[in-house]
Amino acid sequence: EHPRLAGGHLGAAKIADLNDSRFDFERVIPESLAFLRSAGIEKEIPLIAAGGIRSHADIQRVQSLGAAGVQLGTPFAVTEEGDAHPEFKRVLAEARDEDMVEFTSVAGLPARAVATPWLKAYLKIEDRLQAVVHAKNRCTKAFDCLAQCGLRDGLAGWGQFCIDNQLAAALRGDLKKGLFFRGVGE
């Protein structure tokens, strides 16, 4: 997964690393194939590229580098055949690359999503939330969906919201409360 292009939780440890060239497909795919080859398992493990793949040309490019296939997220999520809520599809389909924002999620990972009303409001108060971070005795939402959660565990620097609530709102098509993960293109 290319962290500069993918949506959702990104394949880098810090937001500052999202544009690092060490993640470029032109480097990662050949290096990964070389590792698989050296381990003698290149035939057993297909290398699948993901992040920012939107066209036939994108697929051809990563396959020419040695990828066995690709993973498409947003392009399939918004198809007519998909069973997602129509508003969920509309938000993803109509969002432009400049509508995306990067932030640290409750899992402590860089993430990319559409700058919805909820996400904009959260980011405006994030510094205040970080200033009062503290561990809770239990999950206040009663989900305990993550092994480590910035909100429940009081982890400074990690997101301070219930990701389960926000993702569920997005799936219901609730633009005002939803967290809509989405990638960008090149």
Predicted regions and their residues:
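Conserved active-site-proximal phosphate/metal-binding subdomains
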Residues: 2-25, 29, 33-44, 54-186
